[in-house]
Each structure stands twice: as structure tokens, then as C-alpha cells.
């Protein structure tokens, strides 16, 4: 304020009111009202009462203001009003409307109006004498503490001194805090907090000093102790918008009884109130307790002589996390529960059931630890022994195979243990068990290794030959819960979802389930079971390459090949048997289905497929039947059982099946799949099955083969090639979880001719051979002319293609050629014959291209089934159905090492082909391990790799192979690509056509599947003439689709 107006050279002079107006305002009492209004408005709501009071004490007139400093907006409004009221009476300035619009009624004639455009702060202003802090207005903003009481507000508004108001406010706040925190303990002013004492006794210096002394002593001792404890207090946190006063917090806590008492009584909110925090805080108690625990609790315990315990854990968070984990686990468990619920009691398989339950419990425990594991374990345990359990078990087994080669053996043994009981129900159980390949079965196997297990002779036939040491089984079982479950986590989502459906239809599952289960082993991994047969050429190619590369010949991205009549029958029979039907019933149904569904390379692939329980049953049954007629019934059955794609059937049904279905004569139902993805899958399985059988017969030393397989490259050391196959299948299944076709492409080298080494492939090949040492297979392939041709190029353990012979199966030597021809021609009602017809038709109608994983497709473009004449003709042999080669399946398929169908289906279902190979061997079919056809199909490098792989097997293989499937086996062994021989069928067809189209198509077109399977149907020369083509050739052969 300026007393001398002359000192102001700038500013706007306020329009004064006329004296008459002022007098009237004084008379009406409006002057005082106008004054108050101006004070409140022009001061922007600031409380200048203390300033006005000071001025009154100085004798200055409140109305005698010489200068008004307005904000810039106010100044602008005032100028605008003055401009509008020009030439108007000044009395309008007192109008409330004008005042509201920014008008100012000046009560004096000497008021200057200024405006403040900006505000600033400067260090010198603090010490400037012109700045009177004592006259600063009381800022009214959001209270940072508790609201003032009504009395305090009244005092503040009454005009008390600012200082006295501040003191009163502090005292009132403290009193309220005391009353609040003293709910349990009334607060005593004498023992109040130091802060309160200071505020109350501010005039008393002694009280403040004592409190400060105590506080300083406490803080020194606290900081020292915490530093010695190596937990120094570096920064004091804020609580409720203000920094925590450690001394106040400590005193408040001690008054309430200390940490333990406060925590027990839940009085931390009282401590928070004592600290003067925000009353609206919802986490006051927890935050206060945690700060106390970190900053003061250790010292409190030290002062009380208590042991320095670790700070209490953050219970809420951990509890929440554990609850969430448990919830997730519980949710995961229900996912498997559908299968678990579907599980049917196995009365006749006490040991098997026990093993399954044990495996399930282990799995469940692991599953609890791992959600995916949880899913696997419940599914295996809860699933039907036959259908649900089979599928889930397969899924688990596949994973285990990845983990351990022992899994195949364990599966076989477990299945053996299970199936021995199941065979009592019927071969159906075998098939399903093979399919299921439950981890639980592995424990069973421990109890009684499949080879030694005689609970069911039929099962023994299917699996006994493939022996797995109990220790291996134990390892597999152990790995199953751990590794298998982990892997299953990836696979189970698909597998379990599909298996859940199939378990629901134990008898019906024969149709859908067989497909689904066969696919379930690996198809669910590669492709959803729900889209069988639907696959783009690229997807097919990928699938084929992946299957061959991974050894999952029967892993069809499309899903299981359409169930053969025999396979469906066998599946239904198997399920019926496991459901409780008599073994004979199961056998009959299985026989029918087996006959229709003779084990073939495709069946071998089926064993590779997840759905394998049904497929395995039929293939196993077929293999068992073949084995029986050939004299290797038990081994073949075991091999079939082992090889998931071979349908397992009761020994009777399998024996009947072998009799009924001469593998060579009948076109396997898988041939239909040979063209379409499902059909292709079946074809691969059956072909592989037959090849495995023949190879088994050829490589009688299963043990040797097993050793080789186990020692074979890429095969996890396992006592049984099947386990290896399982491991491989597990890996494959995990890989296949993603879009199967894409995965195949990714996994397989761009050049299909080049085998893509993959741990999965190797295990599959080994398993597929059914225990035949991989080296042995290689040697056999070497020995065979075809293999010799491709030896240098295709020797590669990694790509042990399932040496799958298209000739589905000849149980007996006489049956092989004769029955295969007759059955192909006659379309014998036997499952074989029926299958031959169906497959022939399918094969004729479906180009190999559609085949996903059958090397057979490579050779046969459309005429998967050759006419009997073609079978008789040597050249037809050239039409070799390059069904998914049995890399390891051939080895596994060897009589000595029948793969567990489930294990095979999990890893690769080539084991069943091995069983078929055994039957073929019994029948006298020689399986050329390698053929020039494969050489022609695969580049020299590929063939050499396969040959190298087979070189070890070559010693076991005779140079010439009488059976047309021999070349398939040779091919499978020859080219690591045989699992890749799952090379896209179209590519293979084109390649064959390019190499020697006339031979290939001539053989393919005129022949039936059975004919192809017959030994001697295709001359080895026909295969040999085909020159090996380079990888680029393969690519050119299949230009429409990327091979990688």
C-alpha cells in the first residue's frame, strides 16, 4: 500500500463512488456488506484477517486502501466493465450483477488498481525486510492431516491470532489422535508422544528437552543396532503423506504392548493414527506393520532380549500365490479328469491296474507340481484302461519316450503287464493298452516285464518278444512322472482333449477312437484330432518330413487314418474285451478288424500315431495273428502291441487275424489314408507294421537289433528300441503340438531327400524296428540290393525311416505271397481281404501325395494297391509303397524287439510294423532293407546316410529280399528320410515319376495294396533302376510345396 499517490506513475485509478452513494450505503448498512464482499473477492479467498487486525491495531482505516493488486484476469474483467459502464452512473458499480462480472466499488477516491501478471520466487525474498511472513495469509487448501474440529474452525474464523490458532490446532489434532488410539488404553497426557508433549508443553522448555533427549538416545541406539545387524536404516519411508517418526512409532507400539500384542489384537491402525496418517487410507494397518517390522521390530526384540528371528514373511502375498497355484492345478486336473472319469476298472488286470494307479498317483503328484504333468497323470489313471487310458497313456508315454528310450520298453512291459490281464478281457485291451501305453503300464511292466509277463499269452505274443529290463521300466516310470509329464504337458492338452472323447466311446471308439487314438499318440501333437484328412500339400509334406524325421510315421497331422474295418472291429473288440468281454469275443471282433486291418507299414505308423490304442489294437491283433500263423505269434503280437499302429487283439484274435489276414494279400486300411491324411496315416502304420514284421523275421535277433537301436544315434540309451521310439515320439509329439504340418517342415530339411536328424527320428526308427539293433537293420539294408544301392547315401541312424513294407502282412510264408495275392484279388472277407479291398480302392483313388507320413506314398501315386498280376510281376515291386519308413520301427519291429504299440504310437508307431515284419519273416518274406527306389527317391547323401545307418544292420539283412516290403524296410532304414520318407507323397510320386515314372506307376497302378505287400511282387531291380536323386530333384519333384 502506498500512502503517496504521487509515487505511483502507473496503474489504473479506480472509479470512485459519489459521496451521495457512499452516504446511502452507510445508512442502509450496505457499506459493510460491500466491504466484506470486496475483501473476499479481491483477495481471491485468502484470509487477511490477521493482516486487517494488525492494521486496525496500527490505527489504519480498512477502507482507506490506496492500491489494489488484482490478478490479471480480474484486472481484465474490471477494465471490461468500466468500458461498458462509461457514461453511466457510478452507482451501478455497487450493483451485485456488476460486482459479479468483475466490477469494483472503490470506497475512496484515491485507489489505484494494479495487476500482477506473474509470480516468482527468489532467494533474496526470504531475507527481504519488505516481505512480512507474519502478515502472510492463511492458506486454505486440502488439509494434510485430520480435519480440524468444529471448535477449532470456529476459533480460526473468530479471528484469533494465527499463532494461537496453530497451537490450538495441533493440540486438538493430538487430542483426537489420543482419543482414537486410546480406545483400548486411555491416553495420559503425561505419557503422550513426544510430539504431543512438545505441542502441549511448548511453553515449557523442560518437557520438550526431555522428550528430545529420549528421542535422540533412541534413534542413536536404533541406528547403531541396525547397522551392526547389517540392515542399516538408510531412508525413512513416508506414511500418510508424511515421513514416519520412528520415535513416535516406537512409543505408540510400546504403549499398546509391543509388536506381538498389536499384531494379535490387530491394532496397527491405532499406531497409524498416532503417527497422524491419512484417515482415508485403506492399507494403513498393513503398511504400518510392515514398516515397523523392517525398521523397529529387530531393535524391539533386541531390547527385550529376544532372539533375532527373521522378519515375518509377507503372508498375504504368499497365500494368494499358493492359492492361485492350487486353483490352477485344480483346473488342470479337471482337464484330465474327463479321461479319468472315463477310466473303466480293470478287474482282470490287478497288477496292471495297480501299476496304472501308481503311475497315475505319481503322475498326479507331478501334475500338481506341474500343471501339464497334472493333466497327464489324471488322464492316464482315470482314463479307461482301454480307450481313455490308452490315449492318455500314449500321450504320456510319448513324452516319456522323449525323456527316455526306456519308455517304449516300459510301455511295452507295462502294457505287457496290463495286457496280460487285458488279454483275459481280450486282445482289445492289448490294443488299447498298446494304444494307451499308459505310464501306469510301465510300473506294471516293472512288476512283470512284458517278455516275462505271461498274464496274457496273446499280449505276450504282441509284446513279450520285446523285452525291457524292469530297471529300464522303472526308469521309464520314474521319468514318466517327471520328464514324461513335463513333455506331456505340451502334448496332453491335445492328446487329452482328443483322448477324452475316445475314452467316452470305448466300443464306439473303435471307429473314431482308433482314428483319434492312433492319431492321438502323435497326431494330436502334430495335428488336432478334429481335422483328420484335411491338410494342405505343404502341411502334408511337413507332416511327412516330420514324421519321418521324428520317426513318427503314424503321426498324422490329419488325425488317424480312417479306421480300417478290421481296425475298427478290432478296436471295438478290444474295447469290448477290456470292458469285460470274453477274450474270444474280443478275439473274434479283433480278428475281424485285424483281418481287415492287417498290420502294415501304415499300421506301424498307426502305432506311431497317438490314437494308436485302437489302431494299435487292430495292428497288434493283426500282428499277433500273423505271428501265430507264422510261428512267431507271441512275438508278433507283442510287437504289434508294442507298435501302436498294429492293433492289439487277444492272442486268439491276433492269431486268427494272422490267419485271416495275410498281410501281403490284403490292402491295409491305412492305404486309404495313404492318400488322405487319415488314410495315409493308416497306410503308413500298416505298411510299417508289415515291414517291421518282415524285418523282424529277417532280423531274428531282436536283441541285437534292440541293442543297436538303443545304441543307435539319436536314440536315447534305453533298454528297448521301443523306448527309444517313445522318447522320439514324445519329442515329436511335443514338436507336433504346434501346427503339425509346419512343424514337419521346420523340423525336416528343406530338401526332403536329406534326412533331418532329430532325436525323435532316431528313437522312432529304433523303436520301429521293434528291438532289432539299428546297426543290424542297417546291415540288413546293406545286404539287400536296394539297401546297397542306397547304402552310401542313406546310412543315417537319425533317419531310421521305419522300414515299412507296403505288403501289409503275411502271417505265414505261404500266406504272404499266396494269400496276399488271393486276398487282394479275392478281397477275402478276412479283415485283411476287406482291408485290401478298402485300401485298394482308397489307394487307387487317393494319390500318394495325400499321404502324410507314408513312404509308401512316395512310390505309389495312386495305385497303392496293385493288382494281383502286378504283385506277381516283379516290376510291381518297384511300386513299393514307401510307407513311412521304419527307421527304428524296423529295428523295433524285429521279433526280438516288438515295440509297445503305445510307445511306438507315442514315439513312432513303427514298432507294429516290426511286428508285421516278424510275421512276414515267419511267412518267409524277406524285407529288403534298402532299395534303389529309395536311392532314386532320396539324394545320394540321404541314401548314404540311410545306408550307413543300415550298414550296421546290413550284416543281418540278406542281400536279396524276396518280400516286396523288404525294399520298404531297406528304404526306411536306408534313408533317415524314411520317417521323412514321410516325405510328401506327392513329392515322392513326382520324384519316382521323374526317376522312373513308368516303373513306378506301372507297379502302382496295376497293383493292390496286398500285391504290393507280397514278396517278390516287385523285382528289386525295378527299385534299383531308379537313380538316387539329389535333394534339388526332390524339391523339383514337389515344386508346388515347400519341402522344408
Curated annotation (Swiss-Prot):
Question: From start to end residue, where is composition biased (Basic and acidic residues)?
Answer: 197-211, 301-310, 337-350, 611-635, 644-660, 733-746, 816-826, 894-909
UniProt keywords (A-Z) are:
Activator, DNA-binding, Nucleus, Transcription, Transcription regulation
Q: Which GO terms describe its cellular component?
A: nucleus
Annotated Pfam families: ARID (PF01388)
Bias category Polar residues: which stretches?
Answer: 369-380
Region Disordered, annotated ranges: 143-211, 301-350, 363-392, 554-591, 603-672, 733-767, 811-835, 884-912
GO MF entries: transcription cis-regulatory region binding; transcription coactivator activity
Record domain ARID: where:
212-304
Q: List the disulfide bonds.
A: none
Biased composition regions of type Low complexity, renumbered to the chain: 565-591, 752-767
Subcellular location(s): the record lists: Nucleus
Any notes on this protein's domains?
The ARID domain mediates the interaction with DNA.
- What protein name does the entry list? AT-rich interactive domain-containing protein 5B
Which species is this UniProt entry from? Answer: Danio rerio (Zebrafish)
Underlying gene: arid5b
